[in-house]
Structure formats: C-alpha cells, structure tokens
Amino acid sequence: MLMNSVIALTFLTASSNNGGLNIDVQQEEEKRINNDLNQYDTTLFNKDSKAVNDAIAKQKKERQQQIKNDMFQNQASHSTRLNETKKVLFSKSNLEKTSESDKSPYIQNKQEKKIFPYILMSVGAFLTLGFVIFSIHKGRRTKNESARKSNI
C-alpha cells in the first residue's frame, strides 16, 4: 500500500521535463551548437595573442622553479644539516655504525617456527577433501539407486 502511494505521488508530482513518462523526441534531436560563442572571444584564444600565452607559460615555469629552489636548495642551511643527513642515510661507510633502536629486527632464521597452525590447516584440508569425496560418492550412489528403481 505504501509503495503504491509513493509511486502515485511520484507520477503526480513529476513534470514532463524532470522524470515524466512523456518524452519529447524532437527536443532530444535538436542540436545546440555554438551557443554563446562570443564569450570565448578573448585575447587568450586569438591567434595574435601567442606572445601573451608564452609569457604566462614562462611566468608559471619561473614560479615553479623558484618554489623548487626555495624548498631544496636555498633552505638547506646549516641548521637543517641536509648534507649530513644524506651522508648518514646513504653512505656505505656508515652501514656498520647503525643507530640503536628499541625495535628488534625481523630475522627469519632465528624466528621460532610454529607448527600448530600448519597442523590445523592440514586437518581442515583433510576434512574438506573427505567431505567432497563423501558427497560425490553419495551422489553417485543415489543416482545409481534411482536408475535401478526406474528399471524395475
């Protein structure tokens, strides 16, 4: 009842343009091309304004380069010690001098091998395989019995 009333209200309140069942096919076939073309008649789209576009692109590139320089070159002062940090992180001589950490590394050879999960997985696989074999065997048996009954 509720669904019927919702559908009825939908049909009553739907306008022909917004969700109505009456579709105006001729309105769909009309093509609206080049409406408001004059709004695009600016200096950015003219052939004569190549110099303006090139200047804008040059300003963008200069600004991006300035941002990169500020971030990576000019601000790497003595207080940030960027070069020292790079040497510590990436030099081969500092590999022996590792910093101490409270986290223990994951070394696979020294890890205790737990066999209990593998036992559980093998028992589960064995039971699953047994169930599949049992159901196939039972299905064949019932199929053979029904064939025998139909022959009698």
From Swiss-Prot:
Q: What UniProt keywords are attached to this protein's entry? A: Cell membrane, Membrane, Transmembrane, Transmembrane helix, Virulence
Which residue spans belong to the Extracellular compartment? 136-152
TM segment ranges: 115-135
Topological category with respect to the lipid bilayer: Single-pass type I membrane protein
InterPro entries named among the record's database cross-references: EssA, EssA/YueC
List all topological domains (Cytoplasmic): 1-114
A Pfam family of this chain? EssA
Q: Which GO terms describe its cellular component?
A: plasma membrane
Biased-composition ranges, Polar residues, are: 66-80
- On the tree of life, the source organism's domain of life is Bacteria
Question: Keyword Lyase, does the record have it?
Answer: no
Q: Which family does it belong to?
A: Belongs to the EssA family.
Q: What does this protein do?
A: Component of the ESAT-6 secretion system (Ess). Required for the secretion of EsxA and EsxB.
Protein name in UniProt: ESAT-6 secretion machinery protein EssA
Q: State the species of origin.
A: Staphylococcus aureus (strain COL)
Q: State which gene encodes it.
A: essA
